[in-house]
């Protein structure tokens, strides 16, 4: 687990004298389909006692740019956004996992920058009400996974502002 352990310790904190109070970070896994990214993260979440909240990004598509379920263009996207907001509302002991991020809009992915930096904040919606989620001091981790290529065959480009805050591992190399 050395590959993921340092990042998750940075996000969740560690126990004992080395406990970090400046929790931050984002874990990003890139590889072709079938390499086991989702299975790996489900296993890690289980071992760490975290609730695994998987967001199916292809259901969101490129039209979704906001976290508000009311703005979703279809019921599948709305359901995924409701699940995302539920994970944020639960707050502690959660691993939020965005799967197949190459199928989403870069503007949507950039909404998670605040969770990756020292502020550990994100704006969302809970039961129709705008809400600011503050994850500082909570056992909350965010991970994203994607394919290095988009559905059109082009190379997937991770937004720079997100890439600067993430530990990115290419499992396909």
Ranges and model annotations:
Residues 7-11, 69-83, 108-137, 172:
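Substrate-gripping "pore-loop 1 plus following alpha2 helix"
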Residues 22-24, 48, 89-92, 136-139:
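Short loop/turn elements that form and flank the Walker-type P-loop nucleotide-binding site
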Residues 1-25:
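Pre-Walker A (pre-P-loop) alpha-helix and adjacent loop at the N terminus of AAA/AAA+ ATPase modules
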Residues 47-88, 105:
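AAA+/P-loop NTPase substrate/partner-engagement loops
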Residues 89-117, 153-161:
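Conserved AAA+/SF3 P-loop NTPase catalytic/coupling segment centered on the Walker-B
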Residues 37, 61-66, 104-107, 150-155:
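Switch/connector loops and helix/strand junctions flanking conserved nucleotide-binding motifs
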Residues 118-173:
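Canonical AAA+ ATPase core
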Residues 18-55:
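Walker A/P-loop
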């Amino acid at each position: 687990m050395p590959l993921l352990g340092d990042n998750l310790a940075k996000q969740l904190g560690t126990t004992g004298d080395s406990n970090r109070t400046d929790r931050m970070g984002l874990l990003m896994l890139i590889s072709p389909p079938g390499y086991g990214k989702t299975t790996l993260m489900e296993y890690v979440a289980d071992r760490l006692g975290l609730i695994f909240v998987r967001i199916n990004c292809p259901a969101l598509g490129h039209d979704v740019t906001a976290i508000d379920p009311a703005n979703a263009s279809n019921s599948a996207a709305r359901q995924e956004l409701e699940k995302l907001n539920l994970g944020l509302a639960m707050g502690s002991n959660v691993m939020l996992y965005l799967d197949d991020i190459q199928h989403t809009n870069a503007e949507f992915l950039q909404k998670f920058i605040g969770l990756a930096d020292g502020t550990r904040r994100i704006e969302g919606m809970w039961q129709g009400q705008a809400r600011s989620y503050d994850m500082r001091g909570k056992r909350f981790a965010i991970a994203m996974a994607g394919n290095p290529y988009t559905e059109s065959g082009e190379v997937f480009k991770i937004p720079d502002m997100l890439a600067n805050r993430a530990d990115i591992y290419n499992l396909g190399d």
